[in-house]
């Protein structure tokens, strides 16, 4: 459902989208940004043999990284530079090479300084891991302050 957070300035939306899609770790993992809006994001990747642990299962670090990437796009989607300060993850099911993992980050709450997110990682709509995380919202604006209207900067 659209809301006022989705009303980013068009030039800012495109530049943020380009920036998010250039994420080096996302590229290294072969992941794809499916969607983002302020406070929300969805990232997807298929587990490859290079993503496995010594037992042959998908490495938990890959799932953690996908969740962290999704949360970073959700929290930075307002244009204010945000960095993760804490992430807790629980692994519910193993994953194998060939499994496609979708990491969906959703904002739980946000203040001027901190935002809290829930991240669900699924394979075929089945929950394989879940996480919660906190981001610190700096006073710096991605793309510089001039691209963001005053009312946007005051509100977000």
Regions found by a protein language model. Name each.
Residues 1-156:
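Terminal targeting signals and extreme-terminal segments of soluble enzymes
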């Amino acid at each position: 459902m659209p809301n006022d957070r989705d009303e980013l300035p068009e030039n800012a939306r495109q530049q943020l989208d380009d920036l998010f899609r250039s994420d080096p770790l996302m590229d290294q993992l072969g992941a794809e940004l499916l969607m983002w809006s302020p406070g929300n994001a969805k990232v997807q990747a298929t587990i490859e043999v290079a993503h496995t642990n010594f037992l042959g299962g998908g490495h938990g670090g890959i799932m953690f990284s996908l969740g962290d990437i999704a949360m970073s796009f959700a929290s930075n989607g307002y244009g204010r530079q945000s960095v993760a300060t804490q992430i807790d993850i629980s692994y519910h099911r193993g994953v194998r090479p060939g499994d496609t993992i979708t990491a969906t980050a959703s904002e739980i709450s946000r203040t001027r300084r901190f935002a809290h997110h829930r991240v669900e990682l699924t394979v075929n709509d089945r929950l394989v891991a879940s996480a919660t995380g906190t981001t610190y919202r700096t006073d710096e604006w991605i793309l510089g302050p001039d691209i963001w209207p005053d009312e946007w900067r005051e509100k977000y």
